[in-house]
Amino acid sequence: MSNHLEAKMGDIADTVLLPGDPLRAKYIAETFLENPVCYNTVRNAFGYTGTYKGKRISVQGTGMGIPSISIYTNELISEYGVKTLFRVGTSGGMSPDVHVRDVVLAQAASTDSSIIHNTFGGGIYYAAISDFGLLDTAYHVAQDLKISVRVGNVLAEDRFYNDEMDRQKLVDYGVIATEMESTALFMLAAKYHVRALSVLTISNHLMTGESTTPEEREKSFNDMIRVALDTAAKA
């Protein structure tokens, strides 16, 4: 048991999917995993362990934002020995090359958060990147599943409502989507020498105004989930 998880040692698999929405964790477990068992209900951050294609996999809700995912990632790795982590969640499209419902594989995560400064001090602008092996596997899994994916740099923002952001400049420099967690996930994976990747779905487009419904964001986006799970099964 850790500060925020009531699981016992052995309850959580070595490989974990991390949706921000706890209800998406429940949906993934009940829809895709065989014999899912709930190991956590603390703060309604539901966590489940089951099997997928013969591999033991857990799904843990993290909540939104860098502080929240940092708590769960730290505890999963340091207290429960998790070795491979996949963020699965929504993102906002920014590039004209991505569209609503597209799947994005985050190669790297830029940020406007102070987490890098607080970790490394002034003068160091750390590049938070995903694990190349997971990224490569996920890309080829998507090809095998005939699921179109976009690979690129995403922005992990501290604020969901951020009208001051110069998004066009970010697009000009190759940022394809925005979300709120991946920088922390990639940094912690690097710190603890484990593997991490973010597999995202474009739920809305910040430039065009396209959007999906709240129900879709909770209970669909199955292409993203299948890519993450099939990659996890091979990891």
Swiss-Prot record:
Entries under PROSITE patterns matching the protein: PNP_UDP_1
GO biological process: purine nucleoside catabolic process
Annotated site residues (Important for catalytic activity) in this chain: R217
Top EC category: transferase
Catalytic activity: a purine D-ribonucleoside + phosphate = a purine nucleobase + alpha-D-ribose 1-phosphate; a purine 2'-deoxy-D-ribonucleoside + phosphate = a purine nucleobase + 2-deoxy-alpha-D-ribose 1-phosphate
Purpose: Catalyzes the reversible phosphorolytic breakdown of the N-glycosidic bond in the beta-(deoxy)ribonucleoside molecules, with the formation of the corresponding free purine bases and pentose-1-phosphate.
Family assignment from sequence similarity: Belongs to the PNP/UDP phosphorylase family.
Record-given protein name: Purine nucleoside phosphorylase DeoD-type
Species in which this protein is naturally found: Levilactobacillus brevis (strain ATCC 367 / BCRC 12310 / CIP 105137 / JCM 1170 / LMG 11437 / NCIMB 947 / NCTC 947)
Lineage: Bacteria, Bacillati, Bacillota, Bacilli, Lactobacillales
